[in-house]
């Protein structure tokens, strides 16, 4: 359906009204245009002009409809903005305004007035409100401006109309597409269903059609059209086929319509012509063919196709001259299909009429739209009436033909056949007979076959009907499911669309929100970055201010105490020149004004002003320190110095002292070295200025004696004898007591240690009333440990100490520890820290020491870290660039408070120290244990060390894990010791009631018995011929049948070769095997006995049996050579003999027996059995032969001059290859070989022992010290051991024994317990079995030997297991050592 027709037929009332208004206005414009354009000079209208105007307006209307396809809405007027027309005479354009039409003088006055009113209203809307418009007065307005204004107004209105029309078109287009889709879907379902039903009809009717008619009808089928457009007779339909099936189209025969049915109206004639199948679309043309009732070509073709063909008749021979009778066409019994054809024609007519109606509506635009609809309904009613009339005419025609046929049937048939009536009757009779015969034959033969065929056809039809019903039900169900699914799909799609729309807007909102947040964040980041830059700049200036203040403070102090001069050659040359140039100019600033750090404007003040304020703060801080010391001293009356001869010396004022040089105090009973005397001067100046300090000389340079000397200086110069407090580690308490007593005997030392009761007694000697002690005070110096001072801090805080010395000050390196806080709260005038390693792990430790001595200057660790710590620590760890200027400033700050000298600069006579790293490999057992531990963790050794170093005390699992790795590297026996292996003993052991009842020698011979026992009957033992005790029958039988009896022997010459007589052979044969072996063992020959006797007794020995001889007893003269070879044979081969007895026979058994047991016990009641057992087990000859001969027995035999050959046999039991017992102790050789470190240390100790060195060996684990003690016992090395469990008294004794007894080869020490405060210069070799986390602890430990008094070169060996965690620990220790070298190594 065309869109224009839809618009013309379906618009609402408002649209129709607007169309009417538009049409009227257009006609009015046409009339006006005609009036203007077609009036010539004579006042007549030109017809051509009228036609032209009409055609122009009509074409414009059609073009506007085609472009917009819509009618303007109500209230708008379709007008031409500017209409240009020409007259026939002058052809001048005339502008006609839609607001005010161009009219002539004869126009209607009412129209002119209305137009004037409209014009006035428009002008009134334009003019201002103040302007009063008078209707009676027509203002003068420019016509050109007015026409342009009116045209613009019309263009705007027209654009609004076009926009609204376009919107309506879009809505109609959407509805059209939707309806078309619905029609297509519905038509598809209907077409499928009709095709299936028609196919079933075709298959059922094929069985009823004759062969002739079947072929004709099949030929007549039009296969180019759908199946339902043909007749129901067609091709057979195969079920399940997807091809299209067409039906033959049968057009209905219809009588021509009567002339009276035609109307005079042009529209009715067009509808009738369309219904009759004409193709004439003109409304004005006549329909003569339809009116006269003539057939159209389609109707003629239909009539010709509906005539039956002439049947073939069987007739007799006739004359050729006669004509054939008329043959009537045979009618088909099938009813005609009229309704279907009528519906098709009606549909075609409807389409044509609708098309013509649209055209008419376009042409007759001036008519009312309602009238068009009424005419369409009338046309439809007329068409329906014409169709009914045509059906009635066809039925009447058929009845008339039926009535005429019986009347003229016979004559027409006979005449048609060319026969007479008689002949025709005969022919018909013959024909009937033949026809009957045929039918009889058919009924007899073909009847049953036909019946069967009908049954089969019926059955097949029923089957097809069932299939059709099933398919129809299935199709209906499918259609229903599809409709249901479509409905569900619509709901689902609607929900999905809603969800997607919701997600879209939500995502859109989120995106907008994110963009907004991003923009805001960018603004905030920008502002934050600018603020950070300003704050960083401000903090930089603030830090520079603080550093400058500290520099100036250090500079002012350094000028007073002259640290550079005291350091000597160890000073930094770069600092000397730079210091005086830029800091001396601030020496004269006024220190009375103090500037608060929070009140300083770092953003606006210049650098010079900030430096001057920093100088003022530094000067003020120095004055405060001096005033504090002065206040401490003035709290009690000042003492007079006896050496000043009555002149008062106010030592509280350091400015009065001037630059003095302090000599060595006379009270000090030793001679200070040059660098030590400089240290004394530095300490004395610090005290006089009221400033605390750090004496950081390298270990072994005498920090103890320097600190004792400053105490002696105060006592001797200012009569200040205390109270002095010395806090030291527990291992050096006795050392301090001995050193003070030794160097200053006049000092009374109070050793404050022991249990709580002892310390309570010692506190009675404290004099809390006196601020300063004199020479007669109960004590002068109190020596205690860090642990005890923390425990009794409440008592120490009540005292005011003149001087406090902290030895090994790295013990207070943690500013968060209770030890550091307790010592900081003590009241004392001056503090002195002694440490050889001010930095051990990080810069935080250095800050803790600096804050302890100067809390007012070094008050913030964060600031100190920002100044120096981050840069220096990052350089040491990752080798980054280092700011040399920053490092110089740090050295300048530390110089006044810290004095540090190293050994190579101040002690030339001290021997060198050589450090050697000895790398060891893991053994097989160690590798397995190490791999097992590594498999249980997923981090590397480096990461493990990072976590362990950063972990707190609560993270004990990491420290434990690292300790397990280190235990594997030391020795695998730290996990599991080797057990003693012994077999299972299957027997009974003897028991005793009490050892007190036994004698000194407890005889336990044969005390172990086997659990298995058996009884031997007495008769069997006595009556059987067994070797038993005193049996005459056995002897007689043996004597008769023994081959060793001389009576039974004939050939005895072979006995001379073995030096045995026949009687001796008989004697040996009667002995048991053990007695025989003892008898034959070492039987000397005559020559050997003679030579042995002569050599041992030098010819003086004469046996008793030789004294009865008349002749002298003489020896052989040719025995010198024999004596050398026989007598000294054992002495010459003594080395080989010892090797065979001690080493070759000591083999490690490959297999240890699982169980062992004594012989099975035999019980017998025979006396012979008992005697035999006693003789065997307790034979004195056998026992004396197996065990060595006692010295007393041998001496008695010599005195009785018994011949050697008559000496009882002894010590004949040979050395076993294995031990006598199956109990296996762990092998010490294997114990050494299972540890790579211990095996390497064993080789090293052998060389050191051979070279005469004395060794200090440091361990980290006490269990490893116990294992090493077993090794030393096995090697028979002499040693002593010192660890944390050693008491203070034992420490002193051990150190003294080591220094005085050179036979002690090894001194075993724990690194933490024995690495501090000990003087062990007797050792020249130091070995670290395992290294400490802190490199300074190892440095202090090795300096126990490398210190003053050492004259030999000291070698330090460090055992490190390769490719293990120990190597990582050593690398980390070197990083920490690098930090110390950077900060204090070059000061």
Curated annotation (Swiss-Prot):
Protein name: Chromatin-remodeling ATPase INO80
Subunit structure: Component of the INO80 chromatin-remodeling complex.
GO molecular function: ATP binding; ATP hydrolysis activity; DNA binding; histone binding
Residue intervals of the DBINO domain: 438-563
Biased amino acid composition, Basic and acidic residues: 360-382
Catalysed reactions, as listed in the record: ATP + H2O = ADP + phosphate + H(+)
EC number: 3.6.4.-
Keyword Cell membrane: no
Record localization: Nucleus
Composition bias, Polar residues: 1-24, 90-113
Coiled coil spans: 480-551
PANTHER family: CHROMATIN-REMODELING ATPASE INO80, HELICASE SRCAP-RELATED
Domain of life: Eukaryota
Key words, A-Z: Activator, ATP-binding, Coiled coil, DNA damage, DNA repair, DNA-binding, Hydrolase, Nucleotide-binding, Nucleus, Transcription, Transcription regulation
Cited InterPro entries: DBINO, Helicase_ATP-bd, Helicase_C-like, INO80/SWR1_helicase, P-loop_NTPase, SNF2-like_sf, SNF2/RAD54-like_C, SNF2_N
Biased composition (Acidic residues): 390-401
EC category name: hydrolase
Short sequence motif DEAQ box: positions: 807-810
Comment field on protein domains: The DBINO region is involved in binding to DNA.
The protein's role, per its UniProt record: ATPase component of the INO80 complex which remodels chromatin by shifting nucleosomes and is involved in DNA repair.
